[in-house]
Amino acid sequence: MMTQANAYFYDGADVALLNGQYTDVFSLLGMHSANEGKALIVRCFLRNALSVDVISIKDGRKVASLDKVNEQGLFAGTLGRRVKPFLYLLRVEYPLCQLDIVDPYQFDSLLNSDDIYLFGEGSAERAYEFLGANWRQTQGVEGVHFCVWAPNAKRVSVVGDFNHWDDTRHVMRQHLANGLWELFLPNVVEGAHYKFDLVYQNGERHTKSDPMATQMECAPHNASIVPPKAHHSWNDTAWMSKRAATAWHKAPMSAYEVHLGSWRRKGEQGEQYLDYQDLIEQLIPYVKEQGFTHIELMPISEFPFDGSWGYQPVGLYAPTHRFGDANGLKAFVDACHQAGIGIILDWVSAHFPKDPHGLVRFDGTCLYEHEDPRKGTHPDWDTLIYNYDRGEVRSFLLSNACYWLREFHFDGLRLDAVSSMLYLDYSREPGQWLPNAYGGRENLEAISFLQILNQRLYQAFPGICMIAEESTAFAGVTKPTDQQGLGFGFKWNMGWMNDSLSYLGRDPLYRQFHHHQLTFSLMYAYTEQFMLSVSHDEVVHGKGSLLHKIPGDDWQKFATLRAYYGFMWGHPGKKLLFMGCEFGQRNEWNHNQSLDWHLLAYEPHQGVQRWLKDLNQLYQDMPALSVQDYEGAGFSWLDCENSRDSIFTFVRYGLAGDAPLVFVINMTPQLHTGFRIGLPLAGDYREYLNSDSQIYGGSNQGNAGTVVAESLPWQGMAQSALITVPPLGCLVIGPATGLAEAN
């Protein structure tokens, strides 16, 4: 019933509204029928207002002046003879100004039932188009549609610099059935700062960043930012068509892993990041010159702590502010594509940090994470693990993956820490984890999510590459999902990386006793579609740079590094190398400063860089190095047992008509002359590459560019040749002209 003192509000509604305790605000505020449909009533809540008039948007005429219900800012009034709702604005007189405000409480819900269903089901691929802050137009009025998922909140408001961060000003519409809260706000400008203000069931109030924000403030501030209306105009049609037609498992793929904040810096003391335009002008030409086919970016979703390198993101949908805005990032990706360079994004779906403005206990409950810490917390990083069993969480992650691929044209995702997703007992002692429904250690919900993710992404985005960082022997990581695999395109070969780097750090005198560390990887090379990775993880935290790992004097260090790269580029599998490794960085990586580019003033570093460039060129020119990466017919040992000399010889084969390539790698400083190797074809051979050449900083021991096969069977081949094998060197030998008949 109405109170006698207040004819516009039901008993207690005005008090509840003033105290922020009235959640169904759309039933109260805005325009409503009154007096059994014979009149219209408008109610509004505007703190500090002196007077409020209702103005028709259609003709600009004043319809009514509202009564001031109380001094706290409640206004209400009937609209004379009008009975049909119409669009209006509120002309508000404040002590120092007058404002025209389009009343947000006159608009119906903008949510679509199909979107809501898919979001709850866990299959939404475009949730970012209705959640977060999106520019919309309804009934001819433009504004920002705010929407957030918080099913257990008692009340949610959008607060920002457009309402002086007043939590009672813009209380959102609640959808009880699905836990969504929404509000369409006209009079909001691009770049406005905002957050969501949530009242929990226990009465506590917390402000949170928008989980779907596409732009955020820089730390230590954490407001979300209304995005710009303008969008990037893409010019990469040719690349996207080529990508869709490329079978990457049969194509050359060498990725240059980049941390944008430390690849190179500017400013007198190197204190400034390069922005995206700088990166277009500097990074892209460098990668192109070095012959890499792809750039892999370490995470760029907004993260507050620089020392996390991006692996603890709070704004999963927001490109970090550090290098520019979203349109700048799109321009950078576009420029990569126009230069013929693919670009892969590191994507963190295994965990999220506990920053209070982030996802942790978002609505007062464990919404995105598991309630039980035995399943919901990550013991290694003190972070939280997503609840992959919850449909809305799956939609949040699936939509985010689609967001980067669809809106930014990334050519694939590299998923971080996949092993921690697959196992419930990952880094946990007995009693610290919960088994699955069958009593096992596999995280069945995470496995299902990864399968759905890969299946959906490969269907929606032709030619992308999905890459897993998975460090265990979990079976079927790169098997198709219809064969019960996880459905990734590639998996980092962590076993090869650990073994080969261990071998690299051994004294050449003792390498003969560890020969298997370079040969064992071929025992399992075809169980998955592997990518050989030497990533940022191998040159930090006291591990030292690659050059630092290698024993010996400088000459031996550089020669060994070149030979190692030769082995890596000859080994089956795609390639990934962290920035700085391509020129022999001496210091281990420091995310707070630029790479040591001054080292390129010295010939040994120039030599390593030139060697990598030539390896990449050969890799792209010779199909034998990629077309059968995942077929046993693409590789054959000539001799994998010469541990005494620490020499490795093998052949890489392409398809019919492709020239085979012979690799000879010597991992000791001993020069070998008159060394016989088997050859797959008769005729003259060319020394394509020799890491000991003077142009790479070597001692120039080799075969003067030519090797002649003779009809002497050796190492299972019908012909062979005597060659000179340089110390700590790599030779790549192939047919000089046309192909003779193979054995």
Curated annotation (Swiss-Prot):
CDD domains, per the entry: AmyAc_Glg_BE, E_set_GBE_prok_N
Keyword DNA-binding in annotation: no
Disulfide pattern: none
Swiss-Prot/TrEMBL GO biological process terms: glycogen biosynthetic process
The keyword Glycosyltransferase belongs to this UniProt entry's keyword annotation: yes
GO molecular function: 1,4-alpha-glucan branching enzyme activity; cation binding; hydrolase activity, hydrolyzing O-glycosyl compounds
Transmembrane segments: none
Keywords annotated in UniProt: Carbohydrate metabolism, Glycogen biosynthesis, Glycogen metabolism, Glycosyltransferase, Transferase
Pathway: Glycan biosynthesis; glycogen biosynthesis
Catalytically driven reaction(s): Transfers a segment of a (1->4)-alpha-D-glucan chain to a primary hydroxy group in a similar glucan chain
Active-site positions on this chain: 416, 469
Enzyme class: transferase
EC number of this enzyme: 2.4.1.18
InterPro entries reported for this sequence: A-amylase/branching_C, Branching_enzy, GlgB, GlgB_N, GlgB_N_E_set_prok, Glyco_hydro_13_cat_dom, Glyco_hydro_13_N, Glyco_hydro_b
Gene Ontology cellular-component terms listed: cytosol
NCBIfam families: branching_enzym, PRK05402.1, PRK12313.1
Self-association and partners: Monomer.
Cited function: Catalyzes the formation of the alpha-1,6-glucosidic linkages in glycogen by scission of a 1,4-alpha-linked oligosaccharide from growing alpha-1,4-glucan chains and the subsequent attachment of the oligosaccharide to the alpha-1,6 position.
Family membership noted in the UniProt record: Belongs to the glycosyl hydrolase 13 family. GlgB subfamily.
Protein name, entry field: 1,4-alpha-glucan branching enzyme GlgB
